[in-house]
């Protein structure tokens, strides 16, 4: 009996792109000396407005990366994009000593962002954005600050609801 199996390409986890943000060797001091392991930070996105970040720790880098990718897939959030290329409005957020300022940009601007913030926008699918890191540039703090900023963002529907207007009125006033 032959079973006609379809490929699992329809599953959304195969459509995700992942970028390694940082790899650190960390140690735990035990009675016999130090135990070394690797801590990996990864961002995962579908390049259509969904993004997640995750951290994994293991004695091997490859295993730590697998753990980080699984954690990132579980923590994915939706970010509303304007014209599928930039943010709807400017936003800033703080996490620990890192503060990030994210600004929407005109067509053709590109991703003007440093370090780990650039990785987030690449997997998110943003083409035009300006970002500034103020304070600590520790990749972990910066990534979590960016995600805090994403959670502070409002969709056009939410903005229209707050202003008691229609969505079309909010969008055309840009």
UniProtKB/Swiss-Prot annotation:
It comes from the Bacteria. PROSITE patterns: S5_DSRBD. GO terms for biological process: translation. Pfam families: Ribosomal_S5 (PF00333), Ribosomal_S5_C (PF03719). InterPro entries: Ribosomal_Su5_D2-typ_SF, Ribosomal_uS5, Ribosomal_uS5_bac-type, Ribosomal_uS5_C, Ribosomal_uS5_N, Ribsml_uS5_D2-typ_fold_subgr. Keywords: Ribonucleoprotein, Ribosomal protein, RNA-binding, rRNA-binding. Residues 16-79 form the S5 DRBM domain. One of its GO terms (molecular function) is structural constituent of ribosome. GO terms for cellular component: small ribosomal subunit. Part of the 30S ribosomal subunit. Contacts proteins S4 and S8. The N-terminal domain interacts with the head of the 30S subunit; the C-terminal domain interacts with the body and contacts protein S4. The interaction surface between S4 and S5 is involved in control of translational fidelity. Belongs to the universal ribosomal protein uS5 family. HAMAP family: Ribosomal_uS5_B (MF_01307_B). This is Small ribosomal subunit protein uS5.
């Amino acid at each position: 009996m032959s079973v006609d199996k379809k490929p699992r390409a329809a599953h959304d986890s195969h459509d995700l792109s992942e970028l390694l943000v940082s790899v650190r060797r960390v140690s735990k001091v035990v009675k016999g000396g130090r135990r070394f392991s690797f801590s990996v930070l990864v961002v995962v996105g579908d390049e259509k407005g969904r993004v997640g970040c995750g951290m994994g720790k293991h004695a091997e880098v490859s295993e730590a990366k697998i753990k980080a990718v699984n954690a990132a897939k579980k923590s994915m959030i939706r970010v509303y994009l304007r014209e599928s290329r930039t943010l709807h409005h400017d936003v800033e957020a703080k996490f620990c000593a890192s503060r990030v300022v994210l600004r929407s940009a005109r067509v053709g601007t590109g991703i003007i962002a440093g370090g780990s913030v650039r990785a987030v926008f690449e997997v998110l699918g943003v083409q035009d954005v300006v970002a500034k890191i103020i304070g600590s540039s520790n990749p972990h703090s910066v990534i979590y600050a960016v995600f805090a900023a994403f959670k502070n963002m409002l969709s056009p529907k939410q903005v229209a609801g707050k202003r008691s207007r229609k969505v079309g009125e909010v969008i055309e006033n840009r």
